[in-house]
Design a protein with these regions (language model features):
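Short linear motifs at protein or domain termini
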Residues: 1-37, 41, 45, 82, ...
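Active-site loop of classical SDR/Rossmann-like NAD(P)-dependent oxidoreductases
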Residues: 114-116
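Conserved amphipathic alpha-helical segments that form helical-bundle/coiled-coil interaction surfaces
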Residues: 14, 36, 40-107, 118-127, ...
C-alpha cells in the first residue's frame, strides 16, 4: 500500500566530490580573472556583503545565524562569478549542488566559530583580490573550500542514514 509523506533522498558521496572539484576549478579561474581588476563599484559590493556577514555573526540566535550566513556565503561566491561574467557557470554549479549544500549545513554552519572562520577567509580573499594577489586569494579559497569539507567523513559517519 503506497504511503504519503516526505522522502529525503540519500546523498551520493562521489557526486559531492565531483561537485567540489568542479566548483574549485571554476572559482580558482575566476579569482585569477578578478585579482587586481575589480572596479570601485565591485569592491564596494564585496565589502557590503562582508559587512552583512559581520552583522549576521553578531546575532544571538544560532539557527537564524547559520541559515542567514549560509545564504550570504552563497551570495558572496555568486557575486564573484557575476563579476567575472560567469553567472551561467554559477547557475550550473548551484543547480547541481543540492546534496553538497545539505552536507555544508550539516558539517559547518551549525558551529558559530566556523561561521566566523568563513568570514575571515572571505575578508582576506577580498583584500588579496583588491591588491592583485591572485595566488594568495586562490590559496585562501582552496583552504576555505577544503576546510568546509574537512568534516565530511564525520558527517557521513554521524548521519550515515543520509548517504549511499
Amino acid at each position: 500500500m503506497p504511503k504519503k509523506g516526505t522522502y529525503v533522498s540519500k546523498i551520493e558521496a562521489t557526486d559531492m566530490n565531483t561537485l567540489i572539484y568542479i566548483r574549485k576549478a571554476v572559482e580558482m579561474s575566476i579569482l585569477d580573472l578578478l585579482a587586481g581588476h575589480l572596479t570601485d563599484n565591485q569592491k564596494d559590493k564585496l565589502n557590503a556583503i562582508l559587512d552583512e556577514q559581520k552583522e549576521i555573526i553578531s546575532m544571538d540566535t544560532s539557527i537564524s545565524k547559520s541559515r542567514l550566513f549560509y545564504e550570504n556565503d552563497n551570495k558572496f561566491h555568486e557575486t564573484l562569478f557575476e563579476f567575472a561574467s560567469q553567472s551561467k557557470a554559477w547557475e550550473i554549479v548551484s543547480k547541481n549542488a543540492t546534496a553538497l549544500n545539505r552536507v555544508r549545513v550539516m558539517a559547518n554552519l551549525r558551529e558559530s566559530s566556523r561561521v566566523e572562520e568563513i568570514y575571515e577567509y572571505h575578508s582576506k580573499m577580498v583584500l588579496n583580490l583588491i591588491s592583485g594577489n591572485a595566488e594568495e586569494a586562490k590559496k585562501l579559497f582552496a583552504d576555505h573550500l577544503d576546510g568546509g569539507f574537512d568534516g565530511l567523513n564525520t558527517v557521513i559517519e554521524k548521519y550515515s542514514d543520509y548517504f549511499l
